[in-house]
Amino acid sequence: MPLMPKRTKHRKMQKGQFAGLSKGANFVHFGEYGIQVLERGWITNQQIEACRVAINRFFQRRGKVWIRIFPDKPITKKPAEVRMGKGKGAVDHWVAVVRPGRILFEVANVPKDMAQSALRRAAAKLGLKTRFVERVEQV
């Protein structure tokens, strides 16, 4: 089942702005290791699911995975070969807006090299530059 909100206040949304850095979720909070995005962009619900499957298959029921993003922005699309105008198209898919510094996935209870390999496989499915990060204790 695809990731999407159960209910929304409005069916359709405007494009919005990408400016600035991530306002929160900049540190590994739940797990021991994570991947942090280095550029701004959209990540679709299908990409998030593909990453989750890739990580879980690599771990083979070991470890724990946290998904730190959620696709809450609807993207609309008009059908093929339809003239311009006549209103906004129907909702096609959902995306999560990410800005630089955002932690996307976190993992725990696995060795560092295994976590790095799994998160590298997940990052390959995103189309954005990412880096591997470790948990830093906050003072």
Curated annotation (Swiss-Prot):
<keyword id="KW-0689">Ribosomal protein</keyword>
<dbReference type="InterPro" id="IPR036920">
    <property type="entry name" value="Ribosomal_uL16_sf"/>
</dbReference>
<comment type="function">
    <text>Binds 23S rRNA and is also seen to make contacts with the A and possibly P site tRNAs.</text>
</comment>
<dbReference type="GO" id="GO:0022625">
    <property type="term" value="C:cytosolic large ribosomal subunit"/>
</dbReference>
<keyword id="KW-0820">tRNA-binding</keyword>
<dbReference type="Pfam" id="PF00252">
    <property type="entry name" value="Ribosomal_L16"/>
</dbReference>
<comment type="subunit">
    <text>Part of the 50S ribosomal subunit.</text>
</comment>
<dbReference type="GO" id="GO:0000049">
    <property type="term" value="F:tRNA binding"/>
</dbReference>
<dbReference type="GO" id="GO:0003735">
    <property type="term" value="F:structural constituent of ribosome"/>
</dbReference>
<dbReference type="InterPro" id="IPR016180">
    <property type="entry name" value="Ribosomal_uL16_dom"/>
</dbReference>
<dbReference type="InterPro" id="IPR047873">
    <property type="entry name" value="Ribosomal_uL16"/>
</dbReference>
<keyword id="KW-0699">rRNA-binding</keyword>
<keyword id="KW-0694">RNA-binding</keyword>
<dbReference type="GO" id="GO:0006412">
    <property type="term" value="P:translation"/>
</dbReference>
<comment type="similarity">
    <text>Belongs to the universal ribosomal protein uL16 family.</text>
</comment>
<dbReference type="GO" id="GO:0019843">
    <property type="term" value="F:rRNA binding"/>
</dbReference>
<dbReference type="InterPro" id="IPR000114">
    <property type="entry name" value="Ribosomal_uL16_bact-type"/>
</dbReference>
<dbReference type="InterPro" id="IPR020798">
    <property type="entry name" value="Ribosomal_uL16_CS"/>
</dbReference>
<keyword id="KW-0687">Ribonucleoprotein</keyword>
<protein>
    <recommendedName>
        <fullName>Large ribosomal subunit protein uL16</fullName>
    </recommendedName>
</protein>
